A protein has these predicted regions:
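Hydrophobic/aromatic-rich core segments of domains that either
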Residues: 191-266
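A mature extracytoplasmic/lumenal domain signature
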Residues: 62-64, 111-115, 124-125, 208-211, ...
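Gly/Ser-rich catalytic serine loop of serine hydrolases
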Residues: 184-190
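Intrinsically disordered, low-complexity N-terminal segments that are enriched in acidic
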Residues: 3-119
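Juxtamembrane membrane-insertion context
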Residues: 239-329
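Acidic low-complexity segments
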Residues: 88-95, 102-184, 199
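Membrane-interfacial loop-to-transmembrane alpha-helix junctions, especially the N-terminal start
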Residues: 332-342
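Membrane-interface capping segments at transmembrane-helix boundaries
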Residues: 25, 328-334
């Protein structure tokens, strides 16, 4: 093998090694610093209810598609209940069932959440919505509102902002006031906006989520309006009209249903809580590689037993030591026995 072949082979190996390093560091999030830690949040949902004399079913909407975040781990805590998880139009659902129960019951869902910006663009493009079925007066009011908002806007983003402004000022709007009752909630106003947007052939849906705070404690779910402009999903706060996905907002479920439902019981209460923690970045990277189906961990030293890892850590240092001795011999003038022996 001549020198040219050696240089080409060395360059190919160097490029492959650098590409693998960048992939692990940028895509899988492998830490470069051994003391590096990742910010995570423990989120918890607790369902409390009184069971009835018949079989009981409790359904909880749980996080599924969470732009900007990913689920590191999740677990369910219950006493004797059967558990199934499934995909639903509102996202993922967990359903507990028990033939017979007595006394007040409490069920828990817990998850570890970490920030993952690669999940923002995972959502799919929705079909055009079907026009809402309304009576003649309501249809005329809807068409009048859409025509007025369209005159005051230039694209989907400005159309949605102007529409939300009309809804929030419904008492002064002759069209929107026909659809809203006095004292309507923010979630009801956001859901009404999806009806108006469907009349304008614009896909929209209501997302519900929580703000991941630094301090531990209970949190309340807030609505967020999602609108598709033909290319991507846009996010709007139906209360403040601000556009964009808040950086610490975790989308929990979507749709016009509540976070939980109960069959065969009464007095259902749901509480949400969040707590911030720090976790070794290596554990998060391993979990991310597992979820992505990457085989990079199959060839990693971390897949070996601890004793074998210790041996390899010593072997890896031998070329470094040889390089140091060579520099000391050739540039400093330290006398050695042979090339690498001090």
């Amino acid at each position: 093998m001549n020198n040219r072949h050696i240089y080409v082979l060395s360059a190919v190996l160097a490029v492959l090694s650098l590409a693998l390093f960048v992939y692990k560091a940028r895509v899988l999030g492998f830490p470069v610093n051994p003391q590096e830690e990742t910010q995570i949040w423990n989120v918890e949902a607790a369902l409390s209810f009184d069971p009835g004399p018949t079989a009981v079913k409790a359904t909880l909407r749980i996080p599924g598609l969470t732009p900007g975040f990913a689920i590191l781990d999740e677990n369910f805590v219950s006493r004797g209940f059967g558990l199934t998880t499934r995909n639903a139009p509102a996202g993922r659902e967990a359903q507990w069932a028990l033939r017979q129960a007595s006394g007040r019951q409490t069920l828990y869902y817990r998850a570890l959440i970490y920030r993952d910006e690669t999940r923002i663009a995972e959502d799919t493009t929705p079909p055009f919505p079907a026009p809402p079925i309304l009576d003649e007066p309501s249809r005329a009011a809807l068409e009048g509102l859409i025509a007025e908002v369209r005159r005051q806007s230039a694209d989907v983003s400005s159309f949605t902002t102007e529409l939300l402004r009309h809804i929030n000022q419904a008492e002064n709007d002759p069209y929107a006031s026909l659809f809203l009752k006095r004292g309507s909630t923010v979630a009801e106003r956001a859901q009404l906006a999806t009806v108006f947007l469907a009349g304008a052939q614009i896909p929209a849906r209501v997302a519900h989520g929580i703000t991941l705070r630094n301090e531990a404690g209970r949190v309340e779910a807030d609505p967020l309006l999602e609108v598709h402009d033909g290319v991507q999903w846009l996010y709007f706060d139906p209360r403040t009209l601000e556009q964009g996905l808040p950086p610490d907002f975790l989308i929990w479920w979507r749709g016009d249903q509540g976070i939980a439902s109960l069959e065969g019981g009464s007095s259902l209460e749901v509480t949400l809580a969040v707590q911030q923690n720090l976790l070794d970045s290596m554990l998060v990277a391993e979990r991310r590689a597992e979820q992505a189906g990457s085989h990079s961990m199959d060839f990693s030293l971390f897949a070996l037993p601890i004793a074998t890892q210790a041996v390899y850590s010593v072997l890896v240092m031998i070329p470094v030591g040889a390089l140091v001795i060579m520099l000391l011999r050739n540039f400093v003038g330290v006398k050695t026995f042979g090339t690498f022996m001090p």
